[in-house]
Regions:
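Conserved, mostly hydrophobic/aromatic
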Residues: 59, 67, 109, 177, ...
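Positively charged n-region of N-terminal signal peptides that target proteins for export
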Residues: 1-4
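Catalytic domains of carbohydrate-active enzymes, especially glycoside hydrolases
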Residues: 51-77, 189
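Active-site-adjacent "subsite" loops/lids of carbohydrate-active enzymes
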Residues: 29-46, 118, 123-188, 231
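Aromatic- and acidic-residue-enriched segments that line the glycan-binding/catalytic groove
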Residues: 79-91, 124-159, 198-235
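Hydrophobic faces of well-ordered beta-strands that scaffold small-molecule active sites
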Residues: 33-37, 67-69, 116-118, 194-196
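C-terminal motif of bacterial Sec signal peptides marking the signal peptidase cleavage site
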Residues: 18-19
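Aromatic-lined substrate-binding rim segments of carbohydrate-active enzymes
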Residues: 74-121
Length: 236
């Protein structure tokens, strides 16, 4: 879905560039205009600083005021240096040379008068379409346990769902993601802000792990006798 969106946005951008050659774009009523730079869809495109410079200059000419740079896609890998998470160095067979990706975005954007906000997907750590990410490589215990019509299973088994969400109540993951966030702002204090996505449970089917049951029973002060049916029940 994101790839389709990026292709559509790219087409609209090309059309807009052709229409605006001799015009000075104006931001409506001083409202911010945001351009989103997806991590996975643009991995090869933004593989060198010159490409970043080119697109930032283009969006500036179109009147955009903010660049939203995706630095933690749904795999849980990141696009900045940190000791707390693996760095995404390859996507779909393309290996990116090592450079300060986010740092260059910030430097060039600020030269152009554009704000930079880093975007991070929070309670997710895997891509189910490619069996890739932290819940596949190192931390399967972080994956959300979902209650489906077929029974209780790991979200990594739901191959029609691309985001392998984690259990937000998992304290080990909470420590992990907080370390990632704190290290990001420590390393890049000139960031203008953060945008946090997927700060939630996967949905009504999550989370039905033993951990969630224990935490819920401690919260209400009694045992759940029929689990998961006392929470909700699928009807055929």
């Amino acid at each position: 879905m994101r790839k389709i969106t990026i292709v559509l946005l790219s087409s609209l951008l090309i059309i807009a560039l052709g229409a605006c050659k001799n015009a000075t774009p104006q931001v409506e009523n001083g409202k911010p205009a945001l351009m989103w730079f997806d991590a996975e869809a643009n991995f090869e495109r933004f593989s060198n600083p010159d490409s970043i410079d080119y697109y930032l200059t283009k969006i500036k000419s179109l009147g955009f005021t903010h660049a939203i740079v995706d630095v933690r896609p749904i795999t849980g890998e990141v696009l900045f240096d940190t000791e707390f998470a693996p760095k995404m160095r390859e996507w779909h067979g393309y290996e990116r040379k090592d450079f300060d990706y986010l740092g260059h975005f910030i430097k060039k954007a600020h030269e152009l008068g554009i704000e930079v906000h880093a975007s991070l997907n929070v309670f997710v750590a895997g891509h189910n379409y490619f069996d890739r990410g932290l819940v596949y490589s190192t931390h399967p215990e972080w994956a959300s346990i979902v209650y489906t019509p077929e029974g209780i299973t790991s979200i990594t088994n739901e191959k029609k769902k691309y985001s392998a969400m984690v259990n937000p109540i998992n304290e080990e993951f909470q420590t992990h993601i907080l370390n990632v966030l704190k290290d990001l702002v420590k390393r890049h204090p000139d960031l203008d802000g953060l945008m946090l996505d997927r700060v939630r449970y996967d949905g009504i089917t999550a989370d039905f792990s033993d951990l969630s049951r224990q935490k819920f029973e401690a919260y209400i002060g009694q045992k759940v006798e029929k689990f998961p049916e006392d929470i909700f029940e699928w009807k055929k």
